[in-house]
Amino acid sequence: MPTIEQLVRKGRRGKPKKSKTLALKGSPLRRGVCTRVYTTTPKKPNSALRKVARVRLSSGIEVTAYIPGEGHNLQEHSIVLVRGGRVKDLPGVRYHIVRGALDTQGVKDRKQGRSLYGAKKAK
């Protein structure tokens, strides 16, 4: 056990923080290709048809990513931008698709909170 003097001089080494978005390989965003676009149902007690896509990332890893917002234009072979961020009621979905980037269109007629959905300001 170290003495207080040794701790003052050296300090303790912290535990390294484990990443929750390993497939991004340390990047904030990654490009990928949709291999499958489908809907899935959330865990209890919620009920819906959540839109998700299987995406093969440029890092070579295939992940499941959530498609946020109402309506989308994605299909197989669409090029998308993927960011981290899980969906609490969908097990195994730890990534989000960025709306308004690459092949993904922004959400139509979105008035508030437009930034996350790639919607332009209505004139």
Curated annotation (Swiss-Prot):
Entry keyword RNA-binding: yes
Biological-process GO terms, alphabetical: translation
Keyword Chloroplast: no
Pfam families linked: Ribosom_S12_S23
3-methylthioaspartic acid PTM sites in chain numbering: D89
Entry-linked InterPro entries: NA-bd_OB-fold, Ribosomal_uS12, Ribosomal_uS12_bac
Keywords: Methylation, Ribonucleoprotein, Ribosomal protein, RNA-binding, rRNA-binding, tRNA-binding
UniProt cross-references to Gene3D superfamilies, sorted A to Z: Nucleic acid-binding proteins
Molecular-function GO terms, alphabetical: rRNA binding; structural constituent of ribosome; tRNA binding
HAMAP family named among the record's database cross-references: Ribosomal_uS12_B
NCBIfam families (UniProt xref): rpsL_bact (TIGR00981)
Function as written in the Swiss-Prot or TrEMBL entry: With S4 and S5 plays an important role in translational accuracy.
Protein family according to the UniProt entry: Belongs to the universal ribosomal protein uS12 family.
Record text on subunit structure and interactions: Part of the 30S ribosomal subunit. Contacts proteins S8 and S17. May interact with IF1 in the 30S initiation complex.
Name of protein: Small ribosomal subunit protein uS12
